[in-house]
Amino acid sequence: MNPTQKPEPVYDMVILGASGFTGKYVVREALKFLQTPSSSPLKSLALAGRNPTRLTQSLEWAARPNPPPSSVAILTADTSDPDSLRRLCTQTKLILNCVGPFRIHGDPVVSACADSGCDYLDISGEPEFMERMEANYHDRAEETGSLIVSACGFDSIPAELGLLFNAKQWVSPSVPNQIEAYLSLESDKKIAGNFGTYESAVLGVANAEKLKELRRSRPRRPRPTICGPPAKGPTLENQKTIGLWALKLPSADAVVVRRTLTTLTEKPHGLPGINESPEQIQKREAFWSSIKPAHFGVKITSKSLFGIFRYVTLGVSLGLLSKFSFGRWLLLKFPSVFSLGWFQKKGPSEEEVESATFKMWFIGRGYSEESLASQGETKPDLEIITRISGPEIGYITTPITLVQCGLIVLGQRESLVKGGVYTPGIVFGSTDIQQRLEDNGISFELISKIKTQG
């Protein structure tokens, strides 16, 4: 072999952080597709992390009730050891990164992938991290052919695909003005979120100013052309169409969707693949030509005002205490207190996870004819409601979306962009990702399409 030639990867996929609370669920999901069916692109799998014993225990847990597959390798890697990450990248085609908070642990992994040409997916929901990775590593990843995509978990696959699914319903001459997502979390049992998710939220609020500084330092990008100005909706509303109270949510989803729409403005036909067939090019261009951009926002919902009060309490606690070190110490020391029981260090039980579900409603408002949008004070006269439903968000839906994105990267790499740092919507939107999710328990529905009084 030429000494300058990149060695052939030993593994198709490595799950980094496989012994973590989310990581073990990702392992369980990946095992479903390891050499099954025979056409699966996942032929070889390895688990990576700091502690081989814990990785082995994670594999045993994920394989239950079957014995753990002997073909799954256990590799040692540490985000604080760049050499171990570089070695990891030479051994695999794709890394699924489950090690958070990503603003602390993610940069070295992305750097190693961008330098080596290894593909990378993660489950980050941290806007500052994601935009910093784009700023720091996009050019290098383009050069080496490393495809780097964050937010491939519940943040932000449902929001991205939900927006695209709703946008596709606006058949010409109709155009959307605004699409709002309403997230409803349901469970038969009281379920506590994982501490890692909570820690990421605390650090995200604490570093909000750094995100503003990063954006100010970056070149201005073109904004999508949207028919009509954004509607000025209330912060709190009684959403009678779906029978829920709703509160505006400053989420990563809205940030990721806006980045996707910005990229689409720059590349109206999507991202050209490495070696697409004429049929694949036609399919991609037709898909993106059908997507009309809209103002987008996310709201969290509850059946009662008391539930909304709990969200407000959590938001106020994060906003007030995350800004200084002692406040962050309090938030991270006593997560159950400041989140009113929503987050705890030990995470939910398997029974609690199995009992939970989500619904994400997408209420689109726009115009039955594009010409109406330019008529001054004319209000939207068309409403389209779609919905995505699925299992628990953090430990069932997130592994499903991450693994399916990974399988697309492994099985359809020639039809994807060569390299760069991108959002999941622009990379996977025109693939068969929606059908894959539907095949794995996440449904997409058109609920209604009605004319309203403008």
Curated annotation (Swiss-Prot):
The keyword Transmembrane helix does not apply. One of its GO terms (cellular component) is chloroplast envelope. Belongs to the saccharopine dehydrogenase family. Keywords: Acetylation, Membrane, Mitochondrion, Oxidoreductase. This is Probable mitochondrial saccharopine dehydrogenase-like oxidoreductase At5g39410. Its main location: mitochondrion. One of its GO terms (molecular function) is oxidoreductase activity. InterPro entries: NAD(P)-bd_dom_sf, Saccharopine_DH-like_oxidrdct, Sacchrp_dh_NADP-bd. The keyword Transport does not apply. It is found in: Mitochondrion membrane. Its EC number is 1.-.-.-. It comes from Arabidopsis thaliana. The modification N-acetylmethionine is found at M1. Pfam families: Sacchrp_dh_NADP. Gene3D superfamilies: NAD(P)-binding Rossmann-like Domain (3.40.50.720). It is an enzyme of class 1 (oxidoreductase). Residues 215-234 are annotated as: Disordered.
